[in-house]
Amino acid sequence: WHVAEESIHHRDEDTRSNFLNAIGNILGDSRFILRYLLKDAGAEMGYRIYTGSGLVIPGSSVLTSDPFFLNGELLKEHRHFSLSSGAYKAIVETQMFLKRNVNPVFLGGFIVIDYPIKESKYGYLPPIATSVSLSASIMRYDELMSSIDIGLMMSHSSQGKWNGLPEPNSESLMLSPSIGYLFNTRFGAVALNLQKPYMIFGAFVQNEGDIDQRSDVWQISFALRFLSKRE
């Protein structure tokens, strides 16, 4: 590591504590979004289209200096992670869904863009984050009125900057196909979903120093929606 310590990275720590280049906290960013319904077919067949915009307000858990020492400073102990970038961001989003009477009965998707307004007060300009999602629902018309849901999400992050210098490992592209199963019960609807992210390029694709390492991520989610009781 070019310093006297055994490691300048590996410590038992979390975001609650302060460090040499970090302010600790348990709170990350706050997101405020206003949405406008452009078109709504209601219970009939047709389109439902939303548009929205908002603001990301940075949290208190931030890095206070460049953890990559891009200006050529002497390497010293530092932290790379925080819950917030420390920068304000604008949010723009659009959602469009189509309800049909043939399979797939639901088709749709959304696009969300988080665009940094300016650098944080510590000189960090976060990447532009873009998420695009497409989904479809196929009804099975069985006793449970179940459906099979398939989807694909693309997440892209542009290159961030510290004090005007490109941040390593910040640019990335990830594709996440998913499949789910939704069925109805006496008390409500139950949904199970399985998602497999694939990093196309970015920090988890590169392997510096030919290290014997890999990452393999699966995401499983469970949702339960209760029916309200009516007199």
PLM features: residue spans?
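Residue-level signature of outer-membrane beta-barrel architecture
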Residues: 1, 36-38, 55, 94-100, ...
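Short glycine-rich beta-strand segments
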Residues: 1-6, 37, 52-65, 95-101, ...
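Outer-membrane beta-barrel and related beta-rich outer-membrane complex signature
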Residues: 7-11, 46, 61-67, 121-123, ...
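Short, contiguous, pocket-lining structural segments
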Residues: 22, 26, 82-88, 97-99, ...
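Short loop/turn motifs that connect adjacent beta-strands in outer-membrane beta-barrel proteins
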Residues: 39-49, 62-64, 101-105, 141-147, ...
